[in-house]
From Swiss-Prot:
Phenotypic effect of disruption: Results in the loss of zearalenone production but still produces beta-zearalenonol.
Underlying gene: ZEB1
One Pfam family this sequence matches: FAD_binding_4
Its biological purpose: FAD-linked oxidoreductase; part of the gene cluster that mediates the biosynthesis of zearalenone (ZEA), a nonsteroid estrogen that is a contaminant of cereal grains and causes estrogenic disorders in humans and animals. The ZEA backbone is synthesized from a single acetyl-CoA molecule and eight malonyl-CoA molecules. The reducing polyketide synthase ZEA2 is proposed to synthesize a reduced hexaketide intermediate by using different combinations of its reductive domains during each round of condensation.
Boundaries of every FAD-binding PCMH-type domain copy: 115-293
Lineage: Eukaryota, Fungi, Dikarya, Ascomycota, Pezizomycotina
Sugar-modified residues: 46, 82, 100, 340, 352, 421
UniProt-recorded name of the protein: FAD-linked oxidoreductase ZEB1
Amino acid sequence: MKLSPSKYLPVLLGTLSLTIANPSADCKCFPGDDCWPSAAEWKALNTSVSGNLIKTVPLGAPCHDPMFKGDVCQSLRQQWQNATIHFASSSSVMAPFFANQSCDPFQPRIRPCELGNYVSYAIAAETTSDVQNAIAFARANHIRLVIRNTGHDYLGRSTGAGALGVWTHHLKNIEFVDWDDDTYTGNAVKLGAGVQGFEVLEAARSRGLVVVGGECPTVGIAGGYSQGGGHSALSTSFGLSVDNVLSWEVITAKGELLTVNKDENPDLFWALRGGGGGTFGVVISMTVKAHPGTITSGASLSFSTDTNSEEAFWAGIQVFQDTLEDMVDAGTMVIHIITNTSFLIAPLTAYNKTEAQVKVIMKPFISSLTSKHVDFDVTYKESKTYYDHYNEFLGPLPYGKIRVGFEQYGGRLIPRSVVPNFTETLRQVTNMGVTWVGVATDVGPFGTRATTSVHPAWRSTLVHALLSTPWDFTKPWHDMIKLQDLMTNVIMPKVEAVTPGSGAYVNEADFRQPNYQDVFWGDNYKDLLEVKEKWDPEHFFFVPKGVGSEIWSIAEDGRMCKSAL
């Protein structure tokens, strides 16, 4: 990754008009408006970013006339739920609602391929100056700016109609450093904004280290993942990703490159540690703690109604709920998936523990299942390194096996005190078609409201729950919207009713979450809004359901205008 000095390039300011000419000062300039930049202006921008401006052609274009290519289209259909084809694109998004069926491989060939909610252009940023030029151009022309790395995004924050995208995917620098200050002394790693989980896993392994990253290896580390919190299979051992952040390099709405840490710009440091991606600036790099590598053991366990009565199945779920807190407190992180017919631990992760220790940790759960006559399968595996454990249970690396684009979501942080009494609610929502993915961990010891801006409920949470209903590309759009309506209006209220005062993880939640300010950030929201007003008083940076996003509204065609507050 090349880092240039913090300055606007003369070629940009010398060739682009600073006159904002749009139909309304209350709306961003939109394609087709008189104020939309001319071809010459886009060409000048391209020159200023060394030819890295990309005019969006949707990924699904080969499935539609006049660009139809049958073999390419068939390949796209087969790969559409693989993250790899999307994160290699400057515009494609993985969440199907925000792709809006405007140009996907599953619509009829004769249906026109339209930009829809995709960005109009993107800059494949390779330098700090590329990002600064993108910001300057968007400000000068009063157009929407979107920040994007991989397209892993449930809430529509990395795309937008009529927008210029800053594509950080090529900022791939990884530099290991020694860190020494009054809060941490030890190994650290500086990650460019485009670095993905599988890349840092490999780099850390080569040095005998581990770095907190997501359970999906293709997710970027420094972007929305960490800025929103970032849970990990290592979270019970080291906290959320954001608890491990030591410093950021950030470009502000004014185009200034800042170092942001506990000593320099501490208010912005706090806001970036949980306030959500795309809101306070463009992160260029992030420096995080790197921890010693060691043995890591894992386990998977499953049972279902195929070999158990419904009564025995739900008795097994209750046993799990009763023993989960002790398993986590013994030093494990437990990913579990529950439907109304199946239960799966996938996996339990125990950093710095042997297989024998994992068996001891799980013994009360196993013994209770046996006493309840639940038929189950269990496997254990001790690995020499965390990388090997990850590859075994969350791989195969580098890209893993998590599919994308086939679900829509809701989310909730489930307090410790609630979990043992939660089985009936689980039964109700899974009987409504929900797949429940639980991330059981304890991040309480690693941060406070003073150090991070994630919802304070994280620190007393036992399970972050991600609830999903299916998305079927072959079904009518209105059928899928009905399922999202079910999530927003029926399913999530049931879960919220038994978790009063808690919240949701901002990165994995319902994109239509009511009262999102409180649900995503709790009492931190007021302070986050003050930081937003200080560093971005014009609210140049915007993401849906983000801090300060109330000031903007998005019309049905994607046009972004000031809200009538």
